[in-house]
Amino acid sequence: MSLLFEEIDSQPSELGEISLRRRRIPALGDRDIYEVKLGEEFLMSSMFVEAEEALSTLGLARTRGDKLNVVVGGLGLGYTAVAALQDPRIDELLVVDALETVIGWHQQELVPLGKILNADPRNRYVHGSFFDLATDSAGGFDPEHPGKRFDAILLDIDHSPTEYLNAANADFYTSENLALMAEQLKPAGVFAMWSQNLPEAHFEALLKTVFETVDSHVVSFYNPFLSGESTNSVYVCVKGDG
């Protein structure tokens, strides 16, 4: 281990070796940057979290009422979940992740936001495939309350609607399976999804076959590696009242 780089943990998974790393970049000062890597692919960095946080703020801004029950699909480094818990209307947050190792990093507080999530009684980790649970309308996301419906579902797993962490995830992005997931939303419930790309018209059209309203937001943030701006997107969809 050096001062500038440390591999905190590395474990096998169904998708390949997954590792948690911490590094410092001298040009950026004394800032610890946490990274999650799957095989040779970088999944998440604490250096760029603006869009992950915006997924929560933009999605929850469209919800109605109080005592919200919310699902976050994809734990990552915890930024979407922690941003959601900053909304005082949250009554319960289920964070679903297929990788038990990632949940363990948070439970063991190997990542900075683990302590925040563990200390909040509204937060609960669910180990399972988001995509399998999303299309299981009888069982659903909450193993303790089968068939439960939610005020919002916030998804950040795949890179985009056309670039998948796992090729099997492609099956989710159809009208049929999006509609199955929408059955787990309450009337006027919200589905929001992060993408690394700019909004894609064909995916917006697909979402409109299921949801009453669909809005796409471009989230901009400074990227020091480019000495300029980078962008991600957040799709925010609202189910009909009926």
Please annotate each region the language model reported.
Residues 1-31:
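N-terminal auxiliary segments of SAM/dcSAM-dependent transferases
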Residues 12-23, 36-67:
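Class I SAM-dependent methyltransferase Rossmann-like catalytic core
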Residues 31-39, 156-161:
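Short, basic/glycine-rich phosphate-binding loops at helix/coil junctions
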Residues 49-185, 210, 215-220, 228, ...:
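The AdoMet/dcAdoMet-binding core of the Class I SAM-like
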Residues 159-161, 196-201:
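Short "lid" loop at the C-terminus of a central beta-strand within the Rossmann-like core
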Residues 178, 198-211:
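Short alpha-helix
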Residues 188-195:
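Conserved beta-strand signature within the Rossmann-like core of class I S-adenosyl-L-methionine
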Residues 235-242:
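C-terminal lobe and adjacent flexible extensions of AdoMet/dcAdoMet transferase-like proteins
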